Every structure is written in structure tokens, then in C-alpha cells.
């Protein structure tokens, strides 16, 4: 049961990390240097 809970939390935090990274990368006013990495 503990392994299941750990795996669930890992997936949740993984998607949250991707969502936050994508949000910051798509915000030129907050991170203008991200444009160079997207190309």
C-alpha cells in the first residue's frame, strides 16, 4: 500500500512540475531567456 501511495505522489508531482515548467516557459515577461531554449 505504501508503494502505491509513493507511486501516485510521484506521478502527481511529475505532472505538476511539467505544468509549472510549461507555464513559466510560455511566459516571456517572466522568463525571456526561455525563448532561446524552445527553438
Curated annotation (Swiss-Prot):
Topology in membrane: Single-pass membrane protein
Gene, per the UniProt record: psbI
Organism superkingdom: Bacteria
Span of the signal peptide: none
InterPro entries xref list: PSII_PsbI, PSII_PsbI_sf
Similarity section: Belongs to the PsbI family.
Species per Swiss-Prot/TrEMBL record: Synechococcus sp. (strain RCC307)
UniProt keyword annotations, A-Z: Membrane, Photosynthesis, Photosystem II, Reaction center, Thylakoid, Transmembrane, Transmembrane helix
Record's subcellular location: Cellular thylakoid membrane
GO biological process: photosynthesis
GO cellular component, one term: photosystem II reaction center
Keyword Transmembrane among UniProt keywords: yes
Descriptive protein name: Photosystem II reaction center protein I
Subunit structure: PSII is composed of 1 copy each of membrane proteins PsbA, PsbB, PsbC, PsbD, PsbE, PsbF, PsbH, PsbI, PsbJ, PsbK, PsbL, PsbM, PsbT, PsbX, PsbY, PsbZ, Psb30/Ycf12, peripheral proteins PsbO, CyanoQ (PsbQ), PsbU, PsbV and a large number of cofactors. It forms dimeric complexes.
Function: One of the components of the core complex of photosystem II (PSII), required for its stability and/or assembly. PSII is a light-driven water:plastoquinone oxidoreductase that uses light energy to abstract electrons from H(2)O, generating O(2) and a proton gradient subsequently used for ATP formation. It consists of a core antenna complex that captures photons, and an electron transfer chain that converts photonic excitation into a charge separation.
Amino acid at each position: 500500500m505504501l508503494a502505491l501511495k509513493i507511486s501516485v505522489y510521484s506521478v502527481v508531482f511529475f505532472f505538476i512540475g511539467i505544468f509549472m515548467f510549461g507555464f513559466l516557459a510560455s511566459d516571456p515577461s517572466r522568463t525571456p531567456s526561455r525563448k532561446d531554449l524552445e527553438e
